[in-house]
Structures are given as structure tokens and as C-alpha cells.
């Protein structure tokens, strides 16, 4: 997902590379670790949330700044990314079902899940909302949706559930979902749809008169 001033995040579903070498840096072995840490790791709790949203097993990999930069160079040099990951907060690789999150997205999830931060506003709140939306978005790619506009619209509607699965109260999850929806128009055009609205074709709960 493309990042814009910690307000919106744009995710990528990277194509399978028929000409790819046997492994990329993103495929390196990682320790499984939860809690408040910033090292590169497989994050089991975030993976369980992604699996619940996707309806199938999902692995979530959190990356340190240095490792994220290495992945960026690796993907660009081998044709695996259409744009620099410098502006992307996460991507999903369908060849192995892994969700990869950048340091900012993982930090936001750590703030919410392990540090117990519940800010009313400001940069930390925006980072948490971005992180929740990124995880929901990539989970929708894992579920099988490829189109970015469809994927993001479903993610916006699942941000409340995502936040609660990560430990947020109903009231805080509601505020996170509303923040993500307020930031929705700031996404690039390919992530937007006029049908992403209450009663629209992409409404996951058309009988419920509320949004998102």
C-alpha cells in the first residue's frame, strides 16, 4: 500500500514471477516473535487476524527498516514491483501466501496490540489506523481479491473487525474505522470506487443502514 503522510496506505499484490530466481530476500528464514519489538520477524498474532479475515491460513512478516530497504532493492532489480516500496506499507505475494508489512505498519499494529495505546488523535492515531487498514487490505488480497479498488473497499468495511481482533474496544475500533473511511478519498484513483458506499455494489452488508 502506498503511504501518504501517515493518513492512507496503499497495498500491492505482487505478481508471480515466472522468471524469478529460487528465492528473494523477502523469503529468508525469520524468527517467530510477538510483542513490542521492531526486529524482522514472523508475527503470529497478526497472522491469526489475517487468517481470520482471509478465511485461509496467512503468514504476516514484519520487517525492520534495513530489511525493508533490501527487499525493495531486490524486488525492483528482478522486476517484482511496479513501484518503489519506499511509498508502500505492505504487499502480498500470491506465490506463497505471505503478507509483508513495512516498519511503520508493524509499529502501528504493535502500538494497538501490545502497547495498548488508544490515542484520540494525532500522529500515533493516524499510524494505528493506517496499520489496521493495511493489514485488512492485504488480508483481502490473501482471500483472493486482486482488483485494488475492490480490495480496499472491503478492507475499509473490515477495519472495525480487524481492530477488535487486535484487542481494541468497540468504541476505539469504531474510531479507527471512521478515520480510515475519512482518509479513503486520499488514495490513488486505482484504489477508489464510486460503488464503495452505503448501499453500493461493494457494500458487504447492504441490509444494514450504516457505513463503513
Question: Predicted segments — roles?
Answer:
Residues 7-15:
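Bacterial N-terminal signal peptides
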Residues 61-63, 105-107, 152-154, 195-199:
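Sequence contexts marking disulfide-bonded cysteines in secreted/extracellular proteins
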Residues 1-4:
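Positively charged n-region of N-terminal signal peptides that target proteins for export
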Residues 164-212:
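Long, well-structured alpha-helical subdomains associated
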Residues 32-37, 120-125, 138-145:
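Second-shell loop/turn segments in exported
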Residues 60-62, 144-150, 164-176:
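Surface-exposed patches in mature extracellular/periplasmic domains of secreted proteins
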